[in-house]
Amino acid sequence: MEKHLIALSVAALLAGAAPASADIKMGSLYPFSGPLALLGDESARGLEIAVEEINAKGGVQGEKIVLVRGDAVDNNQAIGEARRLISVENVAGIFGSFSSGRAVAASQVSELAGLPYFELGAVADEITDRGLENVYRANPYARDFAQMIVEMLQKKIAPKLGRDSKDLKIAVIYEDSSYGTSVAKHEETFLKEAGLNMVLSQSYPGNTVDMSSLVLDLKSAGADVVLQTSYQSDSVLFLQQANEGGYKPSAIVGAGGGYSLQPTADAVGHDVIEAAYDVDFTQFAVNTSFTPGLEEFVEAYKKKYGETPRSGHSLTNYVGAKVILEALNKVKGFDAAAVKQALSAVDIEAGKNAMGYGFKFDQNNQNERASMMGMQWQDGKLVTVYPDAAAISEIRLPQ
């Protein structure tokens, strides 16, 4: 009943509204305030640069793209802001959203209104696994995190440790939102399929303020490898309390989130995060022959924002948005059929853009060519160490 009423109200508002200008409005729906604001804002910056570049070349279908912000501070507000963007601002579609929970909630609203929702950064399976016709995702998703983490553990980390990967005691810890639970589920599956020894799998509230008991559980389990899926605050908290508690596993591997942020390294101390691994979207210390256009993006970012990018989230959103907008420029209109036609025709091989991966949308509207990179914190910087074609450094062992 609620979905029916939402659909009716949105349809009624759209029917009675007329666009104020020939500009094409698009929603920019991210957490701009609240605990996820840093990565939300960083993600939105990539979208903004992409739109500026597209507009400088004539826009899309001859019209200028105008971004209208919506602040998805939590899941309920994501729903409210999606409704506002659609019914009041009359956007032709919505870009977002970094947070999986926000994306799942807000994309349901756009689906009911028959408008496209373009996800550029959130990773939960359910975003594109619900059978929604108008939800598209350009970036890698939870399964890709887990696959790369287990692959790197077997092929790079265990050999560097001088250990057989099957002898390692592995713990999976994760924040309990859609993001954490999706990645952890796949980690458990890939570990089991590889015959690796998982000694602990434990969730925790993303807003927790004390992880000392979890550190004790990891010690008790004898875990010498920890796989953590976390946002920034819980990444910082775990690294700090593990260090304070004298817990030093042979390897800590993050699944993006806080582990990809320079402010995380600065907050915990470069000595504390040294040699921690991170699997995530492409970051900036990478072999640029594998990621053409990356250096130009960094220069555009610095020119616009007066600083270097804070994480690769901006790059991911930038590349995904450009691919989508360039595809939309090849069709007529922004209705569901036109969007489907545009994105179904996308066929980009790996190594042709600043992310390094290719683009082709599958039957679920998921970019099936999206993939992850393996990084490590070395001397206060996050550098790419895997795969070899993208690496700029060998991995190091913690001291």
Curated annotation (Swiss-Prot):
Q: Which UniProt keywords apply?
A: Amino-acid transport, Signal, Transport
InterPro entries on file? BCAA_transport, Leu-bd, Leu_Ile_Val-bd, Peripla_BP_I
Q: Could you identify this protein by its name?
A: Leu/Ile/Val-binding protein homolog 7
Lineage at the top is:
Bacteria, Pseudomonadati, Pseudomonadota, Alphaproteobacteria, Hyphomicrobiales
**What species was this sequence derived from?**
Brucella melitensis biotype 1 (strain ATCC 23456 / CCUG 17765 / NCTC 10094 / 16M)
Q: Which family does it belong to?
A: Belongs to the leucine-binding protein family.
Function as written in the Swiss-Prot or TrEMBL entry: Component of an amino-acid transport system.
Please state the span of the N-terminal signal peptide per the UniProt entry.
1-22
Which Gene3D superfamilies did the record assign? 3.40.50.2300
Q: Which Pfam families would you find in this protein's record?
A: Peripla_BP_6 (PF13458)
Q: Which GO terms describe its biological process?
A: amino acid transport
Q: List, alphabetically, the CDD domains matched.
A: PBP1_ABC_ligand_binding-like
